[in-house]
Amino acid sequence: ILDMKDPTHAALIRPISDAVAALTQKHGGLLWGEHGKGLRSQYVPDYFGDLYPALQELKAAFDPHNQLNPGKIATPKTVPQARLTRVDGVELRGDLDRAIDERVWQSYDTAVHCNGNGACYNFDPDDAMCPSWKGTRNRVHSPKGRASLIREWLRLQGQQDVDVVAASDHLRSTNNATSITKLALNTVAKKMGQQDFSHEVYEAMAGCLACKSCAGQCPVKVNVPEFRSRFLELYHSRYLRPLKDYLIGSLEFTIPYLARVPRLYNFVMGVGPVRFILEHV
């Protein structure tokens, strides 16, 4: 298995592709199926042979200035300097993933191993995966979308020398909660539009129902609730939680005391302003 984060493995893309292309051509086969010939365009002339100039003429008729998917499948004869895309000339996902420390990579394996197969883009109403995707039809709210956002978030943290694993361990071992003042200031800055990619990740994670259908049905077992909880742990060490979270979190401690004064509690709950606040918080 090739690890595209390893430059020595990435360098094997060209020789392996050349060998496979030669082997399939030798036996009258193709290097691609219904899709996938675009990034393998350098092999198109070898497979089409004498028909390749006809493809170039067709390309020139509809795209004389080589503006539509340049470098893919065929170059127009009207642009003689145009070249086909080289199989080792495109950016690989591993080029970006190298910014993620290996320890962090292993720790967030339920997110980073998403291979983009798209099984979560499921329209079948009887299939459990994924309810938030089915409800929104927004790919950001799919397991694939959330895994991609987390991987990019980890990459950006790595670029700034932030070790998210160490940060999580520190929070748990020291219970070192950020001061309410700092949390409030950060949250105000967020409301005022201060840029932080974490907010985009948060919006995607907030729509997850934590049903774990992805963990059971995704072919590579992407587990959104698992890495979602870890992200939220760090996110809310920097930004305030919604008020409703604090209210619900306090119920376990306040209900035993409220149970001693049921009439007063019921009266307060029936007051118009209180009901309005509870309905809208």
Model-derived regions, located:
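Mobile "lid/hinge" segments at catalytic clefts and subdomain interfaces of large enzymes
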Residues: 21, 55, 65, 120-171, ...
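Proline-centered turn/helix-capping motifs that create local helix->coil transitions or kinks
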Residues: 24, 28, 66-67, 122-125, ...
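Conserved glycine-rich FAD pyrophosphate-binding loop
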Residues: 1-115, 139, 145, 167-170, ...
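Short, contiguous acidic/charged loop-to-helix segments that flank catalytic cores in large enzymes
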Residues: 7-8, 138, 191-196
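Alpha-helical scaffold segments in soluble metabolic enzymes
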Residues: 19-22, 53, 57, 149-152, ...
